Amino acid sequence: MAEYKNAEGYADPTAFGAFCAIEKEEKALRAFRPIVYICSPYAGDVESNTAAARRYSRFAVEAGYIPIAPHLLFTRFLDDNKPKERDLGLFFGNAILSKCAEMWVFGDRISEGMEAEIKRATWKGHRIRYFSETCEEVTR
């Protein structure tokens, strides 16, 4: 809790107001963080694409969001090289998308899987935001 008086015991309303505003912002950040769906390439250069998806997820956290990157999660126990398991992973991702406030699409290349996810998000009426590989928002 911010103190109304300074170290010398005098009233300091300016500092008090500033500290109260900071405390309010910090409390608001703890109270609510929207969930965003991270959409980025996975297949191909899996190692590089995984590192990029982790970087994009970190960017979302630092921006005050809760990132969900299904291609980082489901590939831990589903084989992306097996069509049935890949389709199952995409199905799971679509289910999770329903719980997300927005979809964030990263990179300048849209893979087949990303295209399906974007179409689904569009169909569901989700807000879709596009970002470069360096996490700068771009228009499409």
How would you label these PLM feature ranges?
Residues 1-140:
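Catalytic phosphate/metal-binding cores of nucleic-acid and nucleotide-processing enzymes, i.e., regions
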